[in-house]
């Protein structure tokens, strides 16, 4: 049994770069990549933010390569790929996990809000992948994994900019998959549901919102970041060599539908 799992899911000898590696989801995914055998480039805004992620990757027996960049700047995105390639020697896997949000109704969103969320959540992914493409092309292939959101698939108040950026990431994933399939590069996305992370903490801390969500999630609870690891390892490994342009939804059944109140 171990042989088939190793053959399909092992990342031994692979290198990966994950952005937003200090965040709630990014840190867990970074450790999972290391546990699967990859050398992991850990990105965030500052080295201080990465201290705990580095410790956890090394505790898992992995090698961590810390990298910093302000993903709000296109030049910094391109430089991050160059730095990662130089430090890692090659780039087999790119995981775009960095994200930000400001919860406001549309009427309260400022141009600065729009620019920040769009730059981090969408523009950075576009130019990180653009810069990574020739690197992966030259080495014979690779894996790009974009962290999208179930907000790609339904409307929710007060997250208009976040939702549109994640919807765009889902579509961008398809287009990149089509353009780069000839280079043996698989581009896929993961769309988490309502997860228990620092970014979503204000939602779960609100009793009304928390109860509203639980009543609509068939599994009746928030997801945990480590429940995204299975999807990550599928998309990062040889188990998904004929899978590209897809968005894997991990949402406790939220998008599948709900129950009548009396059935809950």
Q: Where do the protein language model's features map onto the residues?
A:
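Substrate-binding pocket helix/loop in short-chain dehydrogenase/reductase
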Residues: 105-106, 113-115, 213
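C-terminal substrate-recognition "lid" of short-chain dehydrogenase/reductases
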Residues: 88, 126, 141, 222-250, ...
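Active-site helix of classical SDR
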Residues: 129, 165, 173
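Alpha-helical segment proximal to the catalytic Tyr-Lys
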Residues: 134, 178-182, 241
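Short C-terminal tail/terminal secondary-structure segment
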Residues: 2-7, 154, 233, 244-264
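Residue(s) in the substrate-gating loop at a strand-loop-helix junction
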Residues: 149
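Canonical Rossmann dinucleotide-binding motif of NAD(H)/NADP(H)-dependent dehydrogenases/reductases
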Residues: 10-41
């Amino acid at each position: 049994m171990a042989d088939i799992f190793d053959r399909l899911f092992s990342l031994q000898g692979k290198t990966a770069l994950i952005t937003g590696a200090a965040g709630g989801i990014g840190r867990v995914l970074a450790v999972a990549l290391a546990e699967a055998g990859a050398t992991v480039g850990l990105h965030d805004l500052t080295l201080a933010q990465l201290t705990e992620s580095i410790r956890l990757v090394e505790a898992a027996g992995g090698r961590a390569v810390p990298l910093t960049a302000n993903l709000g700047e296109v030049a910094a995105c391109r430089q991050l790929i160059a730095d990662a390639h130089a430090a890692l020697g090659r780039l087999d896997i790119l995981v775009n996990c960095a994200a930000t949000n400001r919860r406001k109704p549309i009427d309260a969103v400022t141009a600065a809000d729009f620019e920040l969320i769009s730059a981090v959540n969408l523009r950075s992914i576009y130019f990180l992948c653009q810069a990574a493409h020739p690197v992966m092309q030259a080495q014979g292939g690779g894996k790009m994994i974009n962290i999208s959101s179930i907000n790609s698939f339904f409307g929710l108040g007060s997250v208009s900019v976040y939702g549109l950026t994640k919807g765009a990431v889902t579509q961008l994933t398809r287009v990149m998959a089509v353009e780069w399939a000839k280079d043996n590069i698989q581009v896929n996305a993961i769309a988490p549901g309502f997860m228990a992370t620092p970014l979503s903490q204000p939602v779960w801390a609100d009793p009304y919102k928390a109860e509203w969500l639980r009543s609509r999630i068939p599994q009746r609870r928030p997801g945990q970041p480590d429940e995204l690891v299975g999807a990550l390892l599928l998309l990062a490994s040889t188990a998904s060599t004929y899978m590209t342009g897809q968005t894997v939804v991990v949402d406790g059944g939220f998008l599948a539908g709900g129950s009548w109140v009396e059935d809950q």
